[in-house]
Design a protein with these regions (language model features):
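Extended acidic/charged loop-beta regions that coordinate divalent cations
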Residues: 1-84
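A short glycine/serine-rich beta->alpha loop
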Residues: 82-90, 137-139
Length: 265
């Protein structure tokens, strides 16, 4: 059983990302043709040489409304469902469509699933948003050493209106336990959204803040935007002193840095 996401307003005709891994047909090795890309190598692909194509989806997410975080789930032979998703990005659509499809395969009624999704008591997770007066504070997981996850998290900023302050704690927060020396993944990650003039300040925390700062500068982010803090305590104090009172503060954190991100929030 397969599921998919139809073309959205954010889909592109060519790969818009630095990393686009799956370009060859898994059957014959010739180049794939994409009807559209969602991000990186995720989209609707087919092979003009041997006829390979993605299988027909039993469940398809369509009519994605990013502004209101809703989409329509179409199931072969069944009534359509209007469903919400979290996070404001396509990850939320894929995750919700997969979960609902699984529930349908287990025999749950579509109406019951939709009602349960509309009324959950959500636990803290990879995306949270809350208001403090005129200021919106967003925390979002950006998986360490995963350029696709990191690119999609950073791209969220492109669709956030108004002035933005960004906090990056996406490199090794626990070097002594889960340490590594590989920073090549930073160069497969797209940081284009940070170049926008609406992003006023970028705080970078952690022992690898200088590596990340160099990557941002090489990608065209203005150096004067950057504030570097190898020590997370100093980063927290700087945020307390300089935090804006309106707009958006977006805190991106790697897998092991969630306690740090929650403290900064």
């Amino acid at each position: 059983v397969f599921y998919s996401v139809a073309r959205t307003e954010r889909s592109t005709d060519t790969c818009a990302n630095t990393a686009c891994d799956r370009s060859a047909c898994p059957c014959c090795g010739h180049l794939l043709t994409f009807d559209y890309y969602h991000y990186h190598h995720i989209g609707k692909a087919r092979c003009p040489h041997c006829g390979f194509a993605l299988p027909e989806a039993v469940f398809q997410a369509a009519e994605v409304d990013f502004d209101h975080c809703r989409f329509t789930l179409r199931e072969l032979g069944q009534a359509e469902l209007s469903l919400p998703f979290r996070g404001g990005n396509l990850f939320g659509v894929f995750n919700t469509a997969a979960a609902v499809g699984c529930c349908r395969m287990l025999g749950l009624a579509g109406a019951d699933i939709a009602r349960a999704i509309e009324e959950p008591e959500l636990q803290t997770g990879r995306f949270e948003s809350r208001k403090a007066g005129e200021l919106e504070i967003v925390t979002m997981l950006s998986k360490n050493q995963n350029p696709i996850s990191s690119t999609q998290s950073i791209a969220y900023l492109s669709h956030v209106p108004g002035k933005k302050t960004v906090v990056l704690t996406i490199t090794d927060s626990l070097d002594k336990v889960h340490g590594h020396e590989d920073i090549s993944w930073l160069y497969d990650t797209d940081f284009d959204a940070l170049r926008d003039e609406s992003v006023e300040t970028v705080y970078i925390g952690g022992r690898r803040c200088y590596d990340l700062a160099l990557r941002l500068i090489l990608s065209g982010v203005a150096q004067e935007k950057l504030q570097l803090f190898p020590d997370y305590g100093e980063l927290e104090q700087a945020l307390i002193r300089q935090a804006p009172t309106e707009g958006t503060v977006a805190i991106f954190f790697e897998l092991y840095a969630k306690p740090i991100a929650m403290g900064l929030r």
